[in-house]
Amino acid sequence: MKNFNLLAVSSILLVDLFRTQWGHNVHFSKAINLNGVSFNNVDASSLGAAQVRQSASRGRGLGENPKNEEGADKPKKKDEKQVEPKKPRENKLKQPAGNNAAAGEAGNNAAAGEAGNNAAAGEAGNNAAAGEAGNNAAAGEAGNNAAAGEAGNNAAGGAAGNNAAGGEAGNNAAGGAAGNNAAAGEAGNNAAGGEAGNNAAAGEAGNNAAGGAAGNNAAAGEAGNNAAAGAAGNNAAAGAAGNNAAAGEAGAGGAGRAGNNAAAGEAGAGGAGRAGNNAAAGEAGAGGAGGNAGNKKAGDAGQGQNNGGANVPNVKLVKEYLDKIRSTIGVEWSPCSVTCGKGVRMRRKVNAANKKPEELDANDLETEVCTMDKCAGIFNVVSNSLGLVILLVLALFN
């Protein structure tokens, strides 16, 4: 019985195996020979169906239930058949309205755009190379910082440009008429040949001018301060009213009559004038050799006042010391109130010699400051003596 069952099972398996192989060959050959040309033209759905049937046949031979798989495979077949290859899209090579276009008419950053910004040849473009109204343009008429602009600032040949090389009213211009710091400007400050220029070389009214008429610190200015030959110049060499002038009549520090620090001025301060202060021969000069009210080392009044002020003792010390020696004080000088340092000593006046000690006061006494040896010296003596005593005691006990 066992042999029969084994034979039956083996025969069933062999039959299923032959059926599976046969079905596989049929479907695979059909799939290969659908178009008969090449493998690229084989339909993907046919290959999928052949593989599904092959797996189903193998499942039957092994005793599996292929119904669920077939039922699950049916919708997959429909989905695979519905998939169609997409048509390739055509590339549009021409876009008429795009930005950043190479030849666009209104494109930004365009190479030849008429109104493009940063355009190379744009008429109204900013930063344009040849734009008429462009800023920072090379040949723009009204461009700022333009090379040949008429009204451009910092322009090389601008008419009213600031810091322009040949501008008429330009500041700091080389040949400007009214330019400041101009080389040949008429009214320019710090100009080389300006008429009213400050610090001008030949300006008539220029300050610090070499030949200016009213220039300050001018070399030949008439009213210039610190001028070499100016008439009213301060610190002028030959100025008539110049201060510190060498030959000025009213100059201060010169030889003028009213000059300060003048060498021969009659009323000059510090000179040889009659009213000069600190003068060598001045009659009323303070601090001179003939001063009447000056304090001198040999003056009796001044020296006496200084000595009296230095010898006046402290009132509090006098009162305290008087209370201590009231009963013993006489017409002779008492001992010093201290044994070291500065103290006070006193005695009775002649008219208070007969007064009772209780009636004495500060007005009845003569006082003065007394100075004794420094207290540090006494302390040193005491300390040294104590040291010697200690050494002697130690020597005796040892």
UniProtKB/Swiss-Prot annotation:
Protein name per the record: Circumsporozoite protein
Record lipid sites (GPI-anchor amidated cysteine): C375
Organism: Plasmodium cynomolgi (strain Ceylon)
PTM (free text): During host cell invasion, proteolytically cleaved at the cell membrane in the region I by a papain-like cysteine protease of parasite origin. Cleavage is triggered by the sporozoite contact with highly sulfated heparan sulfate proteoglycans (HSPGs) present on the host hepatocyte cell surface. Cleavage exposes the TSP type-1 (TSR) domain and is required for productive invasion of host hepatocytes but not for adhesion to the host cell membrane. Cleavage is dispensable for sporozoite development in the oocyst, motility and for traversal of host and vector cells. O-glycosylated; maybe by POFUT2.
InterPro entries with a match to the protein in the record: Crcmsprzoite, TSP1_rpt, TSP1_rpt_sf
UniProt comment concerning the protein's domains: The N-terminus is involved in the initial binding to heparan sulfate proteoglycans (HSPGs) on the surface of host hepatocytes. The N-terminus masks the TSP type-1 (TSR) domain which maintains the sporozoites in a migratory state, enabling them to complete their journey to the salivary gland in the mosquito vector and then to the host liver. The unmasking of the TSP type-1 (TSR) domain when the sporozoite interacts with the host hepatocyte also protects sporozoites from host antibodies. The TSP type-1 (TSR) domain is required for sporozoite development and invasion. CSP has two conformational states, an adhesive conformation in which the TSP type-1 (TSR) domain is exposed and a nonadhesive conformation in which the TSR is masked by the N-terminus. TSR-exposed conformation occurs during sporozoite development in the oocyst in the mosquito vector and during host hepatocyte invasion. TSR-masked conformation occurs during sporozoite migration through the hemolymph to salivary glands in the mosquito vector and in the host dermis.
Phylogenetic classification of the source organism: Eukaryota, Sar, Alveolata, Apicomplexa, Aconoidasida
Biased composition (Basic and acidic residues): 66-93
Biased composition, class Low complexity, residue ranges: 97-110
Sequence repeats: 97-105, 106-114, 115-123, 124-132, 133-141, 142-150, 151-159, 160-168, 169-177, 178-186, 187-195, 196-204, 205-213, 214-222, 223-231, 232-240, 241-257, 258-274, 275-291
Membrane topology: Lipid-anchor; GPI-anchor
